[in-house]
C-alpha cells in the first residue's frame, strides 16, 4: 500500500479548492496516507491576453499537469472535467468522476438585472462561445466580450469594467463563496452547460493500479454515466470546450436522458435534440447513447455549423 500521494493541480483559487476537496475526501477514507499538493502552472494560466477560442483548447489547462503525471512526479491530477479534452494522452486514464455540483450557468450583473431585465445592447462578458451562441439566440442585441483570468480576477476585472453582466458556471461561483453576487440562475432550456460541467475528473496513470483503486472511492456512478455520455457526444462531433456545443445528461434507475445543442457563434443557427435510453447499465452504453445523439445532430446539420466555426 502506498504511503504518500502527490496531487497535481493548478494554483488558481478554484483549482486549489478542488484539490483540497479531493485531499480531504481521500484522507477521510485513507487516514494513513500522507497526501501532498504540487502546484503546476499551465498554458491556460499564462496566456491571458487572448480569447480562449483564438488560442485553441486541446488541453490548455491540463496538458502541463499531465506531463508531470506521465513523468511520475505526481500520482494523480484533479481537473474541472469540462476542461479535459475527450482524448486522454496515452498512458493516462480518468479514474474517477465526482458527484456533480449544480451544472447551470449564472448571470452576475452590476445592478441585479436578470436576463430579461438587462438593457438593450447590454455588454456581456464571457470567454465561452457556447454561452455566446445561446445568449445571442435569445438576445441578439447583446454585445459580447471577454474577461479572462481565474474567478477572483474575473470578478475584480468585471467590477472595474464597463460590462453590464458576466456569465459564469454556478459550480465555481458557489465553491468560492460568490453566491451573493448571482443575479439569476439560468435554466437548461435557456443555456445548456458545457460537457462535464460541475464535475471533477481525477486522472491517473493506467499502470498505477494502487492509485486507481484509491481514487475509486470518489467515483459517483451517476456522474460517470452522465459525463461519459456527454463526452462521447463531444468527441464524436470532434468538438472542444471552445466550440459552441452544450450537453446535459441525467441518469436515474437505469434510464439516461441526454440533451444537446450545437450553434453558430452569432446565435442565428441552432440545432437542439435529445435522447432517452433505458437499461443503461454500463459506462459503454452511456457512451453509445452520446454517439447516437451526435449522429442525429449531424443529420440535422451540426457538421456544417461546426465546419464554418473551424474556419474562423
Curated annotation (Swiss-Prot):
Cofactor(s) this protein requires: dipyrromethane
EC number in record: 2.5.1.61
Catalytic reaction equation(s): 4 porphobilinogen + H2O = hydroxymethylbilane + 4 NH4(+)
PROSITE patterns noted in UniProt: PORPHOBILINOGEN_DEAM
Pfam families: Porphobil_deam, Porphobil_deamC
Pathway entry: Porphyrin-containing compound metabolism; protoporphyrin-IX biosynthesis; coproporphyrinogen-III from 5-aminolevulinate: step 2/4; Porphyrin-containing compound metabolism; chlorophyll biosynthesis
GO molecular function terms listed in the Swiss-Prot or TrEMBL record: hydroxymethylbilane synthase activity
Cofactor binding description: Binds 1 dipyrromethane group covalently.
Origin superkingdom: Bacteria
A biological process term (GO) from this entry: chlorophyll biosynthetic process
Residues modified as S-(dipyrrolylmethanemethyl)cysteine: 241
Annotated GO CC locations: cytoplasm
Signal peptide: none
Keyword annotations from UniProtKB, A to Z: Chlorophyll biosynthesis, Porphyrin biosynthesis, Transferase
InterPro entries in the cross-refs: HemC (IPR000860), Porphobilin_deaminase_cofac_BS (IPR022419), Porphobilin_deaminase_N (IPR022417), Porphobilinogen_deaminase_C (IPR022418), Porphobilinogen_deaminase_C_sf (IPR036803)
Enzymatic class: transferase
The protein's assembly and partners: Monomer.
Family from the record: Belongs to the HMBS family.
Function per UniProt: Tetrapolymerization of the monopyrrole PBG into the hydroxymethylbilane pre-uroporphyrinogen in several discrete steps.
Note: The porphobilinogen subunits are added to the dipyrromethane group.
Protein name per its UniProtKB record: Porphobilinogen deaminase
Organism (species): Prosthecochloris aestuarii (strain DSM 271 / SK 413)
Gene: hemC
Amino acid at each position: 500500500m502506498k504511503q504518500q500521494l502527490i496531487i497535481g493541480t493548478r494554483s488558481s483559487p478554484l483549482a486549489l479548492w478542488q484539490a483540497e476537496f479531493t485531499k480531504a475526501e481521500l484522507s477521510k477514507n485513507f487516514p494513513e496516507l500522507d497526501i501532498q499538493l504540487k502546484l503546476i502552472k499551465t498554458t491556460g494560466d499564462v496566456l491571458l491576453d487572448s480569447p480562449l477560442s483564438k488560442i485553441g483548447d486541446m488541453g490548455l489547462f491540463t496538458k502541463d499537469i499531465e506531463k508531470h503525471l506521465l513523468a511520475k512526479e505526481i500520482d494523480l491530477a484533479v481537473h474541472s472535467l469540462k476542461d479535459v479534452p475527450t482524448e486522454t494522452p496515452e498512458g493516462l486514464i480518468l479514474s474517477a468522476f465526482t458527484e456533480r455540483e449544480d451544472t447551470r450557468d449564472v448571470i452576475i450583473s452590476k445592478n441585479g438585472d436578470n436576463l430579461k431585465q438587462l438593457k438593450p445592447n447590454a455588454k456581456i462578458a464571457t470567454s465561452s462561445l457556447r454561452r455566446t451562441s445561446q445568449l445571442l439566440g435569445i438576445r441578439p442585441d447583446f454585445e459580447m466580450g471577454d474577461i479572462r483570468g481565474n474567478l477572483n480576477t474575473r470578478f475584480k476585472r468585471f467590477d472595474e469594467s464597463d460590462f453590464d453582466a458576466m456569465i459564469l458556471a454556478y459550480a465555481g461561483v458557489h465553491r468560492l463563496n460568490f453566491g451573493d453576487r448571482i443575479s439569476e440562475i439560468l435554466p437548461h432550456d435557456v443555456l445548456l452547460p458545457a460537457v462535464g460541467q460541475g464535475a471533477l475528473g481525477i486522472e491517473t496513470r493506467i499502470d498505477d493500479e494502487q492509485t486507481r483503486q484509491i481514487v475509486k472511492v470518489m467515483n459517483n456512478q451517476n456522474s460517470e454515466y452522465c459525463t461519459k455520455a456527454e463526452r462521447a457526444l463531444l468527441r464524436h462531433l470532434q468538438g472542444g470546450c471552445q466550440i459552441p456545443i452544450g450537453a446535459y445528461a441525467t441518469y436515474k434507475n437505469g434510464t439516461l436522458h441526454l440533451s444537446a445543442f450545437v450553434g453558430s457563434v452569432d446565435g442565428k443557427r441552432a440545432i437542439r435534440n435529445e435522447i432517452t435510453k433505458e437499461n443503461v447499465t454500463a459506462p459503454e452504453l452511456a457512451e453509445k447513447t452520446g454517439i447516437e445523439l451526435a449522429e442525429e445532430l449531424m443529420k440535422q446539420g451540426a457538421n456544417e455549423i461546426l465546419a464554418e466555426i473551424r474556419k474562423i
